[in-house]
Amino acid sequence: NVDSLYPIILRFPYPKAGTTNSAVKVGYVAASGGETTWIDLPGDPRQNYIMRMDFIPESNDLFIQQMNRPQNTNKVWIATIGGGAPKNILTETDAAWVETNYQVTWLKNNTYFTWQSERSGWRHLYRVSRDGKDVQPITKGEFDFIEQVGMDVKKGLVYFIASPDNYTQWYLYSAELLGKGEVKRLSPMDEQGQHRYDLSPDGKYAEHTFSNSVTPPRIEMVALPSHKTVSVIENNEEAASQYQQLQLSPKEFVKTRSGDLQLDAWMIKPVNFDPSKKYPVIIDVYGEPAGSTVQDVWQGGDLRHQYLANQGYIVVSIENRGAAAQTGREWTK
């Protein structure tokens, strides 16, 4: 739509319930232009999604993730440009649903790639051969691999976020790409809350941000894997001081039960709370997948919730099943 002087708007209506699904196909065209060549992926193009499509580095091969309509099967295909039929090298299935892999990294001259899976009951990182025949765990244990921060290929390390003991708090860990040894926590033990990292390309340094529900973000540059502070970018001391002066009601992290299921929650009580009295309760609900409301992270001091508590309400949020709570497949699904 950019061949002419002015671009042409193309409209694609989203299919409504009961109407025919849109057909999704994968094709390629030369950078210099020409005809589109379509890749013959098995399956009805109206009954499958193309979730991801990336070139494998230093090759003419496409790495394609194809998911069925119920979203409980993710098939990985490798298709060579001009090289015949695509090959299904890996299939991920689950009785409930599967996730798309957004952080595939290629290793060992592009002969292996990283893959996140819940096949063990917990979300972990795996090392998979290019033909899909060799699948080996990089991380192991009863915790969820939350996200990959980066790698130091020379040292053979992957840096990732996990929360083995308390999913409301996030910490940085490292593991050997060969899957040997134990995972190591790198975030400081005395900073309880959530740690976020932006890793340098060589994996030697990271911009580190720490916060929790009562601590505004503190940002620094650290060296890895020692986690030694190189420089402080922003400590937010003034914001922290002003917040403390407000003398707000504390945000309490608690656990409750729904039958046999244990649920995490937080609660903010009115100032001068009297346990002998009854109070109206407001429950803050999200209730959809891929989100989480019970997190020990700075959220602007929860001023909206604090205002409601100041008006005499108890404010509560309870994590529901299906949320991104990083507590294993059985609880989530």
Q: Which residues are covered by each model-predicted region?
A:
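Beta-propeller folds
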Residues: 1-205, 211-217, 221-222, 227
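Serine-hydrolase catalytic core recognition
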Residues: 1, 59, 187-188, 194-333
